[in-house]
């Protein structure tokens, strides 16, 4: 389709469906079909302001420190700001954010110093060199002081009730070694939420076919220490390889049936949806 025809098609889509309709069509063309019902009503799956307030005032019997670890590398400021604001907006407050930065410049360091130096929960380490996704994640894990480790990619965002729901699950199942949640996608350009991944409960057979667990993944720190670091030989599939090692050590793996993780899709992503290739 030539440029003129593309422009005419876009104008027609805007007239018929508006800018939102055009954005959805572009996303479908770039990635995969959209679940229009979810895209239209995604906020119904999120915590309300009233629920958030109740959660903020909830006292659990066990209120562990949760360390959310993030490997950074030339992370766009807009993505990092949204990630951090998502952490600051958590209804559960006993957390720390461990940022391990393998960037060749000090741009991120300066950004954090200018905007977030007052919050001691946000911890930053500038790495001497970029070791890749696995090594940088290992550095972030090494910073962690929490009882549980949550894995967050540098361009993604947690739902406001993510850590609350994790801690609620931990209180309901004190034996839990691994916890994971449902997730959706958020388009970097339009901000549209789409492609929810409503997962099955722990299913070892399905996990042999592909990494359906994916995000949001939380692991007890002692269990993570037992299975060992992320293996850089599996960069690109390091989460999957870690999960498989975890399943060799425990079956105390619990699923939170709520969307707690927003996976940002943009042109720099290698993969954009959970599938056998993830």
Q: Which residue stretches match the model-derived regions?
A:
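Short aromatic/hydrophobic "clamp" motif used to bind/position activated sugar donors
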Residues: 149
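N-proximal low-complexity "stem/linker" segments adjacent to membrane-targeting elements
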Residues: 23-85
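Glycine-rich, basic loop-to-helix element that forms the pyrophosphate-binding segment
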Residues: 127-144
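Short, acidic, metal-binding catalytic loop of nucleotide-sugar glycosyltransferases
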Residues: 85-94
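Conserved donor NDP-sugar-binding/catalytic core segment of glycosyltransferases
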Residues: 161-192
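A conserved acidic beta->alpha catalytic loop
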Residues: 101-110, 129, 153
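Conserved small/polar residues in nucleotide/adenosyl-binding loops
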Residues: 271-278
